[in-house]
Amino acid sequence: HHKMLVMQGCFRCGLYWQGLTHDLSKLSPVEFWAGAKYWQGTCSPNNAQRKAEGYSAAWLHHKGRNKHHLEYWIDYAPNGDHAMAGMRMPNRYVAEMVCDRIAASKNYKGTSYTDAAAWEYYEHSRDHYILHPETRKQLETCLLILRDEGEDECFRYIRTQLLGKKK
């Protein structure tokens, strides 16, 4: 269900290929079997694997193969001080990340989902996210538009402003 929701969101943004190929690494054995073993329906099976085993092999595999995850873009800062820093994400992956967050919120919240859910989830953890300042601004803008103006306006903004598509 999650993949279908992400695909629908990506299609609304004009990201057809990304919608079709979203999270295909979940079919790899390390991700698939962890998902099957730790599935709960109310939170990520990666969290359950992390709690049970001390780390999530599925998540470590997943984040390194999917460019719509902010963790994919963490590297050493270019200024040479060896600190970890968020690199700027290409806009199409920011858009896919928003679609992913909306879909996850719909799945986990079920009938209690509102357009504020993705922002509320982000806000709960935002202080520890390692994000490039421009990527943070783009993500927050999209999530606040979703919260305050709704899904149609959020997808319109992503399509026309973030991605620069005409329709």
Regions found by a protein language model. Name each.
Residues H1-K167:
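Metal-dependent phosphohydrolase cores
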